[in-house]
């Protein structure tokens, strides 16, 4: 009888028990070693996780205890960033890092592809992943990953001969064990054979047929698979798979190949839209109708409607619903522009600004409206513009009957009737109806004047002030 073991390594000594025979196998990697191994696979300084460099600093790499302690403090500060993060955020980082460490290998690999901000986002992502896999991808217990027990019981114990004994592990020659723990039943003695492919065979006439029971969930799933791979088969190419999760991964490659047939997808400047079209958006926001591919993205989006903004800038007091928004905003104060154009060397604060700029070098055709010929740099702006021609104004105000094409416009309009001013200045407590009005007001306290005249160098707080000033130069040139 041959049993396919899959990826199970060589077996440990065989022990005889009252119920049957038990083979216990220890994994060659501990849980901590697996966690360190999966911290990240980046090769560059920026790609390597800061927590990994903090955890793996060795005393031999330093000149003494003082330098070792100093380097640990610096690495910990770079990782946790106490100057920008609160105590709750630092605690969440530590919990999230430990949570990723105790997860199984395949789940760790998937989670590290997405830059999640909190443990709650990771839990939502895993729950969403379980729904996508249809319940077939069972989560493995980390304790079971350390030990995999195989119980082999005889189906006919009454026929067992008293002379049958277990051959000790030391009796097997070393070269034979290296080939796969080769053991067989000869002259009434049990010898278990494992070839190089990981198969276990039992032979010999005195030995009775044996039943195999697997306690590990991984082995349960392997033995429960059909002999012929007919249940998990690709509907397009007919390729068969042992596990349903492998079939889902394979079918996702087909979805990426099938791009949306909409007209906006034909533009070469819309690779982001093509990625969106490769997957369905099954999670919809009940407030504004916006749909998302993952439930974690929906939870993050709903913070906007709830008004929850836990991340605050220490420089100007501006608050954000997401940590990524705060980090992006901090570049305004620091002047950091990390996105570099390889063609002209110009730097940008945001990646979207770099992508928009690179269209100048690539000479990509902008998104053009077929009705009026107006061009836009982004497909989203074109979609909003096309609603003007289609007269699609499905959102109506119950107070005055005015209609709007976007839900966000209707929400802003409602504040006129209700008098709601949700955006408050943290310095003087003055409230505003629009966030843009608050941003203009904060510049008064910060004495910030971002709009500068290219001719005389005079700066202004608002764009309208710059336009009025430029008219003055224009009149002088005409005179």
Curated annotation (Swiss-Prot):
The keyword S-adenosyl-L-methionine does not apply. GO terms for biological process: regulation of transcription by RNA polymerase II. Keywords: Isopeptide bond, Metal-binding, Nucleus, Repeat, Transcription, Transcription regulation, Ubl conjugation, Zinc, Zinc-finger. A zinc finger (C2H2-type) spans 232-254, 283-305, 311-333, 339-361, 367-389, 395-417, 423-445, 451-473. There is a cross-link at residue 17 (Glycyl lysine isopeptide (Lys-Gly) (interchain with G-Cter in SUMO2)). It is found in: Nucleus. Residues 155-187 are annotated as: Disordered. One of its GO terms (molecular function) is zinc ion binding. GO terms for cellular component: nucleus. Residues 51-133 form the SCAN box domain. Residues 174-187 have a biased composition (Basic and acidic residues). Transmembrane segments: none annotated. May be involved in transcriptional regulation. This is Zinc finger and SCAN domain-containing protein 26. It comes from Bos taurus.
């Amino acid at each position: 009888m041959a049993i396919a073991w899959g990826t199970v390594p060589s077996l440990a000594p065989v022990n005889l028990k009252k119920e049957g025979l038990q083979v216990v196998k220890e994994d060659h990697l501990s849980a901590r070693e697996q966690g360190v191994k999966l911290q990240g696979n980046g090769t560059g300084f920026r790609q390597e996780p800061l927590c990994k460099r903090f955890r793996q600093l060795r005393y031999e790499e330093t000149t003494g205890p003082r330098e070792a302690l100093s380097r640990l403090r610096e690495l910990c500060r770079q990782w946790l960033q106490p100057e920008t993060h609160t105590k709750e955020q630092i605690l969440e980082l530590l919990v999230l890092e430990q949570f990723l460490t105790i997860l199984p290998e395949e789940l760790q690999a998937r989670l590290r592809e997405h830059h999640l901000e909190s443990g709650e986002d990771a839990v939502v992502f895993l729950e969403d992943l379980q729904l996508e896999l249809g319940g077939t991808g069972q989560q493995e217990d980390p304790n079971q990953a350390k030990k995999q027990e195989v119980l082999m019981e005889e189906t006919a114990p009454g026929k067992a001969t008293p002379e049958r004994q277990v051959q000790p592990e030391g009796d097997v020659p070393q070269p034979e064990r290296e080939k796969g723990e080769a053991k067989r039943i000869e002259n009434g003695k049990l010898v278990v054979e494992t070839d190089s492919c990981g198969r276990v065979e039992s032979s010999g006439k005195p030995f009775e047929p044996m039943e195999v029971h697997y306690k590990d969930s991984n082995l349960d799933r392997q033995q429960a698979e059909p002999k012929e791979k007919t249940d998990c088969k690709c509907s397009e190419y007919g390729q068969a798979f042992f596990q349903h999760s492998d079939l889902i991964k394979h079918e996702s490659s087909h979805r990426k190949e099938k791009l949306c047939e909409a007209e906006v997808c034909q533009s070469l400047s819309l690779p982001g839209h093509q990625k969106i079209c490769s997957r369905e958006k099954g999670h919809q926001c009940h407030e504004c109708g916006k749909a998302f591919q993952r439930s974690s993205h929906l939870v993050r989006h709903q913070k906007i409607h709830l008004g929850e903004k836990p991340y605050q800038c220490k420089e100007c007091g501006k608050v954000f619903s997401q940590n990524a928004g705060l980090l992006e905003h901090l570049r305004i104060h620091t002047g950091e522009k990390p996105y570099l154009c390889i063609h002209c060397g110009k730097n940008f604060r945001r990646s979207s600004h770099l992508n928009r700029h690179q269209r100048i070098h690539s000479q990509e055709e902008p998104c053009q409206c077929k009705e009026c010929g107006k061009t836009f740099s982004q497909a989203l702006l074109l979609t909003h513009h096309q609603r003007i021609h289609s007269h699609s104004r499905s959102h109506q105000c119950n107070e005055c009957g005015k209609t709007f094409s976007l839900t966000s416009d209707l929400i802003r309009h409602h504040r006129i009737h209700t008098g709601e001013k949700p955006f408050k200045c943290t310095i003087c407590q003055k409230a505003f109806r629009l966030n843009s009005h608050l941003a203009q007001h904060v510049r008064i306290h910060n004495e910030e004047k971002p709009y500068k005249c290219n001719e005389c160098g005079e700066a202004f707080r608002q764009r309208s002030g710059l336009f009025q000033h430029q008219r003055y130069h224009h009149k002088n040139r005409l005179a």
